[in-house]
Amino acid sequence: MGKIIGIDLGTTNSCVAVLEGGEAQIIANSEGMRTTPSVVAFTKDGERIVGEPAKRQAVTNADKTITSIKTHMGTDYKVNIDGKSYTPQEISAIILQKLKSDAESYLGQTVTEAVITVPAYFTDAQRQATKDAGRIAGLDVKRIINEPTAAALAYGMDKLDQEKKILVFDLGGGTFDVSILEIGDGTFEVLATAGNNRLGGDDFDQIVIDYLAEEFKKAEGVDLRNDKMALQRLKEAAEKAKKELSSTMSSNINLPFITATAEGPKHLNIDLSRAKFEELTRGLVEKTMEPTKTALQDAGLSTGDIDDVLLVGGSTRIPAVQEAVKKFIGKEPHKGINPDECVAAGASIQAGVLAGDVKDLLLLDVTPLSLGIETMGNVMTKIIERNTTIPTKKSQIFSTAADNQTAVDIHVLQGERSMAYDNTTLGRFQLTDIPPAQRGIPQIEVTFDIDANGIVNVSAKDLGTGKEQKITITSNTNLSEAEIEQKIKEAEMNAEADKQKKEKIEAFNQAESTIYQTEKTLNELGDKISSGEKEDIEKAIADLKAVKDNQDATAEELKKATDEVMTKFQKVSQEMYQKAAQEQQAAQGAEQAQDNGPKDDNVVDADFKEVDEDK
């Protein structure tokens, strides 16, 4: 059986590892480096180059050099090179092929299976895209694992007998995740996760790029961002300065011959201090704190409950980031793991678990966002709540909204808002051939099944006929992860507005149901109810219909009008019930009187006398 490798497919850098002798070994690439830049380039001759060689030639070949493709996974984004379009999956597959090749060179055998990591906040579409990229690269992706969870595995592999609660703070090149885990007795259980998939080292670089470009524009009147070659040089200089400022107090950015004007060549020479860098990027550092607070709240923990803090991703080397985490949690972050390599190491440990090489280790991850379907009134009805342990399977019974409805549309949603249109559509499908019946009679069981990779399967089954329709969610969300993180924030900010909307929808649905049931029962009762009582109820129904048809009516007004109908109808029902009970008692009394009749002495005596005479 071949080895299963562990891959950290990163935004800026990627890494591959394998489990040997019970320990994760990072595999060096063909250039001798332990991490590989996630860069793909196409030369003038059509040759495809990956990693460090691709990064080195980016200045002179900016148009055909692709970076940070991970940020486009799960979208319809295309890269056009020499008239050919490439999807993010294809570009990612090129990087994976490089990592696969390096692993094969190290192991001396063909590699066909892998565990690949993704940000914890990746959507279903992005996870599916990652699996597709692996397949294009010739890899059977045995498991998709969340990056913070993989880091926790690397950290806790030698601490299986210890009980700890850890916070993983993962700030990479393009994404940010924070996860809270509890480890003990060989179990790694994710308690909560939060994040922002549009926040990472690239954003820090961009701020430095803009600062340098603006400073140069002030001095020379030229915007370097309009020159692709100059912009690429700025990008490289900004990244280098950012890294230098993690260990020094100042960095000199010196780019001779950065551009030229009619006056001659122009040079860029700017000193950037750590203090200035921290001032420029303070907003980005602060952005990492909100998801951290959310994760702690969702886990039901306080900062004092955290035993260890793991810093993962190259961007956590920034001193201001480390200081912010230390200040918020109140303890020094753990420095015992390599932030660039621990995710791949953890992936290789999970690969070892799947291969049977690692015993007594159980990983319990969670789904980052709630899943549900659209129900009557555009309401998002959640079936699986966010931070539910996966794999999981949950079902809920629904019914039809109209009489003789023979089909139902299942609109699958992901998000935290109350209204369907405020959430992300994952897919749609239809369950047909439902036997005609009154509304509310058919029983439609909707089941959500999330596998260990976080991939969603949804089915709808008519319990009456056994007919079933299934869908594996593979749809493209066309949505940035910043928008997904925004959904949770919006849900908190708009909680009251959402609550009012939902209450009105529920009141509207209750009103419709009350009207339907009351009118139906009145028709069935016919002349059993007096005309005066019937008119009284019909007037209350008419009043309720008027309120229901008023767009400006509040939930309270709908409830009040609904209660009026129910009160009047219940009063009549009670009177009818009492009348029926009295009639029943009277009938029983008459029957009892008849039963007592044969016990009359004369009758009994006569019967006995006849018998005696015969004898």
Curated annotation (Swiss-Prot):
GO terms for molecular function: ATP binding; ATP-dependent protein folding chaperone; unfolded protein binding. Gene3D superfamilies: 1.20.1270.10, 3.30.420.40, Actin, Chain A, domain 4, Substrate Binding Domain Of DNAk, Chain A, domain 1. The keyword Magnesium does not apply. Keywords: ATP-binding, Chaperone, Nucleotide-binding, Phosphoprotein, Stress response. PROSITE patterns: HSP70_1 (PS00297), HSP70_2 (PS00329), HSP70_3 (PS01036). CDD domains: ASKHA_NBD_HSP70_DnaK-like. Residues 573-615 are annotated as: Disordered. It comes from the Bacteria. Residues 597-609 have a biased composition (Basic and acidic residues). Residues 580-594 have a biased composition (Low complexity). Induction: By stress conditions e.g. heat shock. The modification Phosphothreonine is found at residue 175. NCBIfam families: PRK00290.1, prok_dnaK. Acts as a chaperone. Belongs to the heat shock protein 70 family. This is Chaperone protein DnaK.
